[in-house]
């Protein structure tokens, strides 16, 4: 069993397993998000003005990094993973993530698409018409995960990385001797 003789040795010892645990949690969040996007966004209604691409399922990325004193992970909207459509009304990709009228004609809507869908921002016909109502998958994702799943996934991730852990509901007080 490895032994740490200083705080820095302990940090060095735990850095890799904790980073692996964070990656595990990020993968779980990514998978849960696919389910939430399906339920909240795609099953909410069927559009009449455009064909769906399903790109919002995959428009997310994860990133993890560690420093000498911290490890962290990030789950975020990544519009670069989405396709951009056409302004041609005859195209099957008409109005897919692109402005089709007025001042927004030909402008890429992907950077704002999550805000448009989740927040029901009213753009009129500029980025596809008639978003019927807010379909806030982000809030639902946070509700579904909550503190319990986050804690459970972190424990599972740390155990998968080779650490034996015991989770607590209150912070532990450590006294150095």
Task: Set out the residue ranges of the language-model regions.
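N-terminal, Lys/Arg- and Ser/Thr-rich interaction peptides
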Residues: 1-20
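Charged, low-complexity interaction tracts
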Residues: 2-4, 8, 46-177
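Conserved aromatic-histidine-acidic binding/catalytic patches
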Residues: 17, 21, 25, 29, ...
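Non-globular disordered terminal and juxtamembrane segments underlying protein topogenesis/assembly
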Residues: 21-44, 150
């Amino acid at each position: 069993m490895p032994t740490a003789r200083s705080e820095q040795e302990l940090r060095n010892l735990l850095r890799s397993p904790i980073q692996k645990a964070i990656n595990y949690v990020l993968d779980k969040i990514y998978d849960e998000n696919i389910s939430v996007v399906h339920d909240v966004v795609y099953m909410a209604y069927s559009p009449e003005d455009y064909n769906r691409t399903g790109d919002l399922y995959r428009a997310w990325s994860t990133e993890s990094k560690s420093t000498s004193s911290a490890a962290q992970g990030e789950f975020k909207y990544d519009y670069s993973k989405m396709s951009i459509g056409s302004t041609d009304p005859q195209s099957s990709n008409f109005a897919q993530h692109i402005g089709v009228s007025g001042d927004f004609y030909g402008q890429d809507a992907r950077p704002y698409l999550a805000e448009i869908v989740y927040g029901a921002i009213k753009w009129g016909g500029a980025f596809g018409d008639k978003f019927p109502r807010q379909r806030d998958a982000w809030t639902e994702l946070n509700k579904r995960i909550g503190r319990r799943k986050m804690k459970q996934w972190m424990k599972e991730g740390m155990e998968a990385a080779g650490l034996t852990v015991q989770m607590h509901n209150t912070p532990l007080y450590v006294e150095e001797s």
